[in-house]
Amino acid sequence: MVLSFSETVNGTHANADQIALRSQAISGAVNYTVLGGATLEQAGCPPVLKLELAQSDANAIKNVVSLAAASSSTYLSLGSSTVAGVDGNSIVAISSGAAVPVSSYTADSTSPTLLTFTINMNTNNMMMNFDEPVDVGAFNANSTTIQGPQSEATGSSVSLTGGSAVVSSDGLQVML
């Protein structure tokens, strides 16, 4: 995320936790305040700050379907202590009702990757862990195949024929 300012800012004392992404420029819209772990890097002219979100923040934003899903659902509000000008003056806060729309938007084009899975044959449950949130509504259990070792010549496998999927609140785990 790149934030542009009307004058040079002092990025050494920037507070990422004063930044909130919003789905609309109205009070009561879906929003997400950056929790921390984000890194801010000051760049030259024009006066900009580059914000690299912590993975936990990026995943949390992706997990809110109506937030930052397109340019039409991506707005930003800032607290006055987000950053100061080089003269020490605080920036003008941008309230939730006056949130600024994104000027350039790049959609997430990276598909989630399965990291690990566990299976419990006593409870008939399988837990799959992904590297980013998944949309349980688009998850198709019938597209899941469990196979034996790749080195096995017979290539034994079983394709699932049903079951219901439940996703964890952070979107990173799916239980069948």
Task: Set out the residue ranges of the language-model regions.
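Non-catalytic beta-sheet/beta-sandwich ligand-binding modules that flank or precede catalytic cores
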Residues: M1-L176
